[in-house]
């Protein structure tokens, strides 16, 4: 008669340990690398994957991508939000029993939780929030509505900025509040007023760092002294050097978690003298021209406001040449007649032409949306605002400058049904271009911050005891 075999205590203990290990390994919190591969809607064919350069030549800090730069397995229909998991040994553990976690580790663990929440939202096609949501993104205007919504929830819940306090007005801590560069000053003022929920109490709590220096104000001050813009370059670099020498944060990341904002045409030139030093630095720019060094995976395209339509730039000159006051259906004015109301004209129009001027951006994009007019983007090399999450092809029309002579034929070829669909979607996305003070969820200031938030989630800081 066979005897009853009883497992030894050693084997039971070993089995329990193995089961515990498997539970920890497959936990969503351990899978902390969410890589957001951007392929912005641009008037040029761009489909880059995010691979951040390593360090600046002036520091030794190692800034890593949040996951392997290899092409990730995509869980989505469109590329901007895709997930990849790299070697588990490179993951940042969410609990350490051996030693006390550094503040940098705590920050990175916080971002890991955000990535896990976004991953779950994509997988479950739902969102998780601890507060009532005032708006639920949905529909094809978003590259992935679930990813965007959960990402915005995580940003509101977690994202903290440190605004450097060094420097004095008028070049620092303020910017233009009206006219063509107004978004620059409005954003700086929102961050400077001190009541934004995104502001960190201490710099060591911050996920990202804002340099509140205004390129427009620098130009205003120094252009009168020397009507040439290169003297402004060392002013910006000097400011960065001041905060880099006073705090450890720039050198820790080689500038990868730092950003500036500017709507001035000359803003892209501030890094020209030392591209290596600024190669990781996030620039939030209206002049988002990929042919002039704008990198969609690193930089952020900023919507421009408040346009007056004088002829400047080759594209507008070409537009005036072919269509200026030549057709009742294609109304193109260099200077609007006194009896005409600009915003009324936009509101009465089906399609609003948004040509580039001397630089690629056009404020008419925003104005068209306010009037529920379908924007017609006429530009080369322009990375459109918020194209990390918005699919511009679903609510705008794109016409390359070389086809301006065919403008009427192209627009006439759009059926009434297609036009009404585009217009309905314009109304849906218009909320993302509204400027509110104080900022509100999903408005333009939140969208700018969300663009920075995405880029911050795509890097991993070195684990030093800062």
Give the positions of each predicted feature.
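Juxtamembrane luminal stem/stalk of type II transmembrane Golgi/ER carbohydrate-processing enzymes
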Residues: 2-263, 267-332, 336, 427, ...
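Catalytic binding pocket for nucleotide-activated donors in carbohydrate/polymer assembly enzymes
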Residues: 341-434
């Amino acid at each position: 008669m066979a005897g009853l075999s009883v497992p030894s205590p050693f084997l039971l203990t070993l089995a329990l340990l193995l089961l515990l290990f498997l539970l920890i390994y497959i936990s969503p919190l351990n899978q902390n690398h969410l890589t957001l591969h951007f392929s912005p809607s641009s008037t040029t064919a761009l489909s880059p994957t995010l691979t951040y350069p390593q360090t600046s030549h002036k520091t030794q800090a190692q800034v890593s991508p949040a996951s392997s730069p290899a092409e990730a397995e995509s869980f989505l229909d469109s590329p901007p939000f895709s997930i990849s998991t790299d070697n588990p040994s490179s993951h940042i553990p969410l609990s350490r029993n051996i030693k006390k976690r550094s503040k940098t580790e705590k920050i990175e663990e916080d971002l890991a939780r955000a990535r896990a929440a976004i991953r779950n939202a994509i997988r479950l096609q739902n969102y998780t929030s601890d507060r009532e949501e005032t708006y639920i993104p949905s529909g094809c205007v978003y590259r992935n509505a679930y990813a965007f919504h959960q990402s915005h929830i995580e940003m509101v819940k977690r994202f903290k900025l440190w605004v450097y306090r060094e420097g004095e007005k008028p070049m620092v801590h303020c910017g233009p509040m009206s006219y063509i560069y107004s978004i620059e000053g409005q954003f700086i003022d929102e961050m400077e007023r001190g009541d934004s929920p995104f502001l960190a109490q201490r710099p060591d709590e911050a996920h990202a760092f804002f340099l509140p220096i205004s390129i427009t104000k620098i130009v205003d001050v120094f252009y009168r002294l020397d009507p040439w813009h290169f003297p402004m370059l060392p002013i910006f670099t000097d400011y960065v050097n001041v905060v880099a020498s006073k705090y450890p944060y720039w050198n820790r990341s080689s500038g990868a978690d730092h950003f500036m904002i500017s709507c001035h045409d000359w803003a892209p030139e501030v890094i020209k003298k030392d591209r290596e030093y600024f190669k990781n630095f996030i620039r939030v720019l209206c002049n988002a021209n990929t042919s002039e060094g704008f990198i969609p995976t690193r930089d952020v395209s900023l919507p421009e406001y408040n346009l007056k339509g004088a002829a400047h730039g080759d594209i507008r000159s070409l537009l005036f040449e072919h269509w200026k006051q030549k057709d009742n259906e294609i109304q193109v004015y260099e200077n609007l007649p006194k009896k005409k109301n600009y915003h009324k004209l936009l509101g009465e129009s089906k399609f609003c032409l948004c040509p580039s001027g001397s630089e690629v951006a056009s404020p008419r994009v925003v104005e068209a949306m306010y009037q529920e007019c379908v924007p017609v983007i006429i530009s080369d090399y322009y990375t459109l605002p918020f194209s990390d999450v918005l699919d511009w092809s679903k609510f705008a029309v794109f016409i390359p400058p070389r086809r301006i002579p065919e403008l009427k034929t192209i627009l006439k070829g759009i059926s009434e049904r297609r036009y009404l669909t585009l217009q309905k979607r314009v109304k849906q996305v218009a909320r993302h271009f509204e400027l509110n003070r104080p900022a509100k969820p999903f408005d333009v200031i939140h969208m700018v911050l969300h663009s920075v938030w995405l880029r911050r989630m795509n890097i991993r800081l070195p684990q030093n005891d800062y």
